[in-house]
Amino acid sequence: AMTVPGTKALVGYSGIYDLEKAAITMKTKDAQRIAYFCDRDPKVLREASPINLIPKKNVPASMLVCGTCDVTVECEQSEMFASALKKKGGVCDLLTYKYYDHNVSSKTSDKMEEIFFKSVDFLTTYMK
């Protein structure tokens, strides 16, 4: 979304935004996962990381959702991305759910409906 001209808004759920710093990328010993992340090639990871793709102007409004107990993709990924977006002048709503894991927005979560409606409201506001 960051590289598509005219993008007005982005909503991210439990996302990896800096592949070079994500625990799922750097700490895994799983060969399949390592291969999925291009054998951890720093150049590829840097070029594919949304945190490095934020435009210099017209930063899309963003809403990021994460759970503080996410062991799949640490919540710090969303926190770092939110900070970087704001530094570039973007609007970013960071919704952090204490004690929730990677499935904070899944259909099994008691927060699913709340997050869905917050997403709709956010997109309705910024897609005008």
Positions of predicted regions on the chain:
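Conserved serine/cysteine hydrolase catalytic core
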Residues: 50-59, 76
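Mobile cap/lid helix-loop segments that gate and shape the active-site cleft of serine hydrolases
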Residues: 16, 20-53
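Short beta-strand/loop motif that positions the catalytic acidic residue
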Residues: 57-58, 63-66, 70
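Solvent-exposed loop/turn segments at secondary-structure junctions
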Residues: 16-19, 69-71, 99-103
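Alpha/beta-hydrolase-fold catalytic nucleophile elbow
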Residues: 11-14, 65, 97-98
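Conserved catalytic-core motifs of eukaryotic protein kinase domains, centered on the activation segment
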Residues: 23, 75-76
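C-terminal catalytic histidine-bearing segment of alpha/beta-hydrolase fold enzymes
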Residues: 76-128
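Short glycine-enriched nucleophile-adjacent loop
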Residues: 1-5
